[in-house]
Amino acid sequence: MVINKWVFVYSEGHSLIKNGAWFVGFTDFSNVPGMLNDILYINRDGLQICYTTQEELDRVKEEGKVFFNETYQKKFKKAIDKCINNFIMLYDSYKTMNLRKLTNKELLCLFNKYIECECVLLAHYQVGGGRSFPLLEKYVKDGLVKQFSESEFNKNCTLLLSSHEIDILEKEEISLLDLGLNPSDEVLLEHANNYSFQFYNTYEIEIILNFLKERSKKLNQDYGSSKNYLEKKNKRKKLLLNEQKKQFNKIKNKKLKNLILFLREQGKLRLEYKEWKAGEEYKFLELFREISRRIGISLKEYLSTYKIEDTQLFLNKGKTIELKERDARKKIFVYFQKDGKKQFASGNKAEYLVEKILGKSKNKLTELKGISASSGKVTGKIRIILPIGIKEVQEDMKHFEEGDILVTTMTQPNILLIMKKASAIITDQGGMTSHAAVISRELGVPCIVGTYNATRILNNGDLVE
């Protein structure tokens, strides 16, 4: 196996447990489109990169044809809604528990239910990540090219795929404004639990409080109140809705209209789902804190070194992971599946496996292409930011200047402040319904998604148009 047979899928910061759940979510659900027979996860120092083969991506793209069927669209939405509802019911039950009083077997039962909810949700969430919808997106773009003139196409494509409803990011900002100028720490932490999607890969209370206080101050400076915020947003969304209706009614192709509505809805829903895709670890943080306490290690150590199976083994039989193995996993670990055979390795064994799979190729990547998710033309300096956690985001904010072009593997809600300063956004991952695509259309800035390698071709400080 050599490197040109394996292609980038996505990259972000993960705990080891979350990485394991993603691995299961990508491989173990044959009833969900987008499963990968061949997949490689490499996690170095907490930042992982996922690869698969081009053949797998081509197959998954073909599988995506099922979404041309309106009945299947509804079936899929019903399935993912069920995933969310199951997670909510588990969380409601979890909040009433005194974890200290649970036996190890009772804690194991709770942990297993959490993992089951997480894996099923991730299996469904990955469908809209830019791999299953390309044929739908192509059909929509081709249809709009025929419908509108060349000068109108980009503007109307962006317009028709934009949501005119208040989304979860805006609801969170409204809620934060409603807390007033100087909310207490207790009130802010309650807010954090209600909108935990922002705290992906972030576990330190002090960092979370500082992040919310900074944002609260900025929102109050910009808007003064949630009433002013809503008036401004609603005015814009009313104009958007009126123009949408005007352009949408020009389209006579019923199939095209259905797919526009489906992709628009998927973009909005993927934001809503992030509360449980990106915020679930924070919501269940006390569960992980209790497990790490019983093991006798810090929360950070636990999340970076314990697999799902390790936690199950500890809670069932009391077996722990040796320090040497934990240290190896902090440096590098690998999940790999080829032809249905699964492997996990860490440390030197992981390095050997990566070299065996990818080879030592140092071929320089030069080609950059992607999907235009929001039209426009700008010139600016490149600033590469990787989605790890709030601590890293706050450090990146210090170096990101107004008008810089944001380049990242994929965007998360916790970099929204940076996205608002960007003159354009470029991502390795994603499609027309991705977070970057949706937010760029709301912000009215150009966006290119699904480049696969922008973070590896472009460099900080590069001036691009």
Where are the regions that the model predicts?
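Non-catalytic, soluble scaffold/interaction modules
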Residues: 1-465
